[in-house]
Each structure stands twice: as structure tokens, then as C-alpha cells.
A protein has these predicted regions:
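Core dinuclear metal-dependent hydrolase active-site scaffold
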Residues: 3-6, 16-17, 102-128
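Metallo-beta-lactamase
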Residues: 91, 111-116, 121-198
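Short, acidic/turn-prone active-site loops that include or flank metal/cofactor-
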Residues: 8, 81-83, 139-140
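Conserved beta-strand hairpin/beta-sheet module of binuclear metal-dependent hydrolase folds
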Residues: 1-45, 126-136
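Active-site neighborhood of phospho(di)ester-bond hydrolases with catalytic His/Asp-centered motifs
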Residues: 29, 50-57, 76-80, 116-119, ...
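Active-site HxH/HxHxD metal-binding segment of metal-dependent hydrolases
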Residues: 26, 33-110, 188-194
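A generic "binding-loop/recognition-motif" signal
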Residues: 11, 34, 58, 82, ...
Length: 198
């Protein structure tokens, strides 16, 4: 997988551009801000944007979706559970497809499995692509997503983190904010992945 990371906006949300080697298409994950910058990056890579994948619906992850989708006509995927809180999206959340636990997406030459990981929001998902986990705001390096915002659920994120800890092997962890990590490091040193603290 070819990958570029763009920390964008005031909250430095990580937007990821990814594609399989040799593919003429790419995907964006969580384009929260700066749509013109992201569109320019797609052009610089000489790719066609096939889809936007959203890990959840907070503004810092979805703010750039509408203009990017309008410009490119790309598909936009979000977990169906995120759409059950309409007041959060009074300005209209643009999407074309919903995903659920266990769905497998084939985009830009990549195969991505959807893992429903509620807690930060009811519809948070991670995307597992080979040895890489796009963890959104569920798992960060050394910590986890907050649960004190509307729709947050402390017990749910506990279960989601334990589920991620139980995934097989080591994985590269690419979170919604902050530095990349690995699942082995998070299992060992992230206090929120230690079952005993709950």
C-alpha cells in the first residue's frame, strides 16, 4: 500500500491518502479540513479519487467531504450507526454508502475490512487493510478517544479497545490524531488497552 498522511486543520486531524501500488485510483480517509489542499495532492499523485472513507462523523473528520465529493464525484462511506443522531448533522452530512461490521471494501486496489468500534461515537469504525489499522478516534498512540462528547460511551470504548487488542499479530496503527504507532506497542504500553485498569 502506498500512503500519504496530512495532519490538517486546527485539531491536526490525520487525513490519509492510500492506494495500491500500480493503481490509478486512490482513497481519502477522514478529510476533515482543507479540501483544496487535499484535491491538489490527489492531482499531484496523478490519481482519480475513488472514495472517501469516514471513521466517524465529527466535524474535524468530515468537514472537507462535501466540496471534495462535489469536485470528484467520489463515493463516501460512513457507518450506518453514525446516522442515528441527526441533530449532530444539521448542516447535512454528505455520504453515498453506509458500512457495518464485517463489510469488506475493494477500493483503489486495496481490500479494507470494516471493524465497528463504538465508544467515541456510536458509529465509530476502524478500517483494517493488510497489516495497517486506520483507527480513527478509537485508538491513539498511548491513549484513546474521549467519551465525554454527545454519543460517547465509556463502556463501549472499553470493549472496542479490548477487541482491537485481541487482533492477531502486530499492525501499524494510523490514528485520527497524533503519531502513528503499532498494535504491539499499544498492547504493552497504552494504559487504556490494559484490561486490568477497567
Amino acid at each position: 500500500m502506498e500512503l500519504k498522511t496530512f495532519p490538517i486543520g486546527s485539531l491536526q486531524t490525520n487525513c490519509y491518502m492510500a492506494w495500491a501500488e500500480g493503481s490509478e485510483k486512490c482513497i481519502l480517509i477522514d478529510p476533515g479540513y482543507e479540501p483544496e489542499l487535499l484535491l491538489e495532492q490527489v492531482r499531484l499523485q496523478r490519481k482519480t479519487l475513488e472514495a472517501i472513507l469516514l471513521t466517524h462523523g465529527h466535524f474535524d473528520h468530515v468537514g472537507g467531504v462535501k466540496p471534495i465529493a462535489a469536485e470528484t464525484g467520489c463515493k463516501v462511506y460512513i457507518c450506518a450507526e453514525e446516522l442515528k443522531q441527526p441533530l449532530r448533522y444539521s448542516d447535512g452530512l454528505h455520504y453515498t454508502h453506509t458500512v457495518a461490521e464485517g463489510d469488506v471494501l475493494h477500493l483503489a486496489g486495496l481490500t479494507l475490512q470494516v471493524l465497528h468500534t463504538p465508544g467515541h461515537t456510536p458509529g465509530c469504525v476502524c478500517y483494517l487493510c493488510g497489516d495497517t489499522l486506520f483507527s480513527g478516534d478509537t485508538l491513539f498512540a498511548g491513549t484513546c478517544g474521549r467519551t465525554d462528547l454527545p454519543g460517547g460511551d465509556f463502556k463501549a470504548i472499553q470493549a472496542s479497545l479490548q477487541r482491537l487488542a485481541a487482533l492477531e499479530g502486530d499492525l501499524k496503527v494510523l490514528p485520527g490524531h497524533g503519531m502513528a504507532s503499532s498494535l504491539d506497542i499499544e498492547r504493552r504500553y497504552n494504559p487504556y488497552m490494559q484490561e486490568r485498569i477497567w
